[in-house]
Design a protein with these regions (language model features):
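Flexible hinge/capping segments at coil-to-helix
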Residues: 58-69, 73-95, 183-186
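N-terminal winged-helix
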Residues: 1-36, 147, 186
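Secondary-structure junction motif
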Residues: 7, 93-117, 182-187
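Short beta-strand-to-loop elements that line the ligand-binding cleft
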Residues: 22-30, 119-129
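Short beta-strand-centered segments that line the small-molecule binding cleft or hinge
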Residues: 4, 10-14, 31-69, 73, ...
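A late-sequence structural motif
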Residues: 7, 159-196
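Ligand-binding cleft/hinge of the Venus flytrap
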Residues: 11-20, 42, 106-120
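Short secondary-structure boundary segments
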Residues: 50-51, 75, 148-150, 178
Length: 196
């Protein structure tokens, strides 16, 4: 999605300067569809949310961003005035989830995360991308847990607040064929500095 690509914008820019002749194409899709396309050789690389992604032995990855998670909530919601939000204050409020995180491990981890926060019974809503999630949240009817750096996008009508006692990080991964000898893939991967 847009967020995942955003995590590697500077590397794409640098790669394009180094290899102006290279043809770069972008394809959006769910984690499952992108992993499937990688496995079938239809893609050279994919940038995915690392939450619950299980890579087969034929794939390798680099972390493009490891980002603290925060609550994204409407700026007009009373909780937006707080510096930090306790999970119990979110009880009963619908949660907006990103449909792109469609693998069973991802869905299970996300469900477990909300359950550990005491929010197992909150109604779920689904959207196809971060902008749609932000628009739903802007209405004041729902919230979501998001990577903190999404706040840099300047999305009007939403705010980001830490969740008391919640220290999870969102990891985004560049995924590529393990041991690839393709010079384009190797050159691009070398631009991703190792992160924790």
């Amino acid at each position: 999605g847009a967020y995942e690509l955003w995590t590697i914008v500077s590397q794409i820019r640098k790669y394009h300067r180094q290899h102006p002749e290279a043809e770069i194409e972008f394809q959006l899709g769910s984690n499952q569809s992108l992993l499937g396309a990688l496995a079938e050789g239809q893609l050279d690389m994919a940038v995915l949310s690392g939450f619950g992604v299980e890579l087969g032995k034929e794939l390798d990855s680099r972390v493009t961003l490891s980002d603290p998670c925060m609550v994204m909530i409407s700026a007009s919601h009373p909780l937006a005035a707080k510096k930090e939000i306790h999970p119990r204050e979110l009880k009963g409020m619908p949660i907006v989830l990103n449909r792109a995180q469609d693998s069973q491990p991802s869905a299970g981890l996300i469900a477990g995360m909300y359950a550990n926060m005491g929010l197992r019974e909150n109604k779920r809503m689904y959207a196809d991308d971060f902008y749609s999630i932000a628009l739903i949240i802007n209405t004041g009817i729902a919230f979501s847990i998001m990577p903190a750096s999404v706040a840099c996008w300047g999305i009007d009508g939403v705010v980001f607040r830490p969740v008391q006692g919640f220290k999870a990080k969102a990891r985004t991964l560049l995924v590529y064929p393990r041991g690839s000898q393709d010079t384009g893939i190797r050159s691009f991967v070398s631009l991703i500095k190792p992160k924790r």
